[in-house]
A protein has these predicted regions:
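A short, structured loop/turn motif at beta-sheet edges
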Residues: 66-75, 90, 102-110
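Short, aromatic-enriched amphipathic alpha-helices that serve as compact interaction elements
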Residues: 1-15
Length: 126
């Protein structure tokens, strides 16, 4: 998980390509929506993220959980903090919780599915 945060922060959104399984079984959901229904959809969508995000910083919280299911599969979860800056310089500061199923194949870990859950700020009181 440290490698994921490091590479995404250093290389930008394009780094996600090496961590997301490029296969039909892959999916990525965020806030209750299916963002990428397959590895091919993620691969096709990442270039758009590269255009929309000039800079990104991803850090995981100290609450990382890893539940090994087999020698090749594990479920992971952790809080996260992400700062994204768009090409105009507008900054988005986001916190939430990440979960995913990781698979070890071809000498490395990749996510077979992921879910991002964002902490929604409280509604203003009147």
């Amino acid at each position: 998980m440290r490698t994921v945060a490091h590479d995404v922060s250093e290389q930008g959104p394009s780094a996600w390509q090496k961590f997301l399984a490029d296969e039909p079984a892959f999916f990525l959901a965020s806030e209750g929506l299916l963002v990428f229904p397959s590895g091919a959809a993620a691969k096709a969508g990442i270039p758009e993220l590269v255009r929309k995000i000039k800079h990104i910083e991803l850090t995981w919280g100290d609450d990382l959980r890893v539940d090994p299911l087999t020698a090749e599969f594990a479920v992971v979860g952790a809080s996260y903090h992400e700062v994204r800056v768009d090409p105009k310089g507008d900054r988005l500061d986001e916190k939430g919780f990440f979960t995913g199923t990781a698979e070890y194949r071809e000498g490395r870990w990749q996510f077979r599915n992921t879910h991002w859950s964002v902490i929604v700020p409280p509604a203003p009181t009147h």
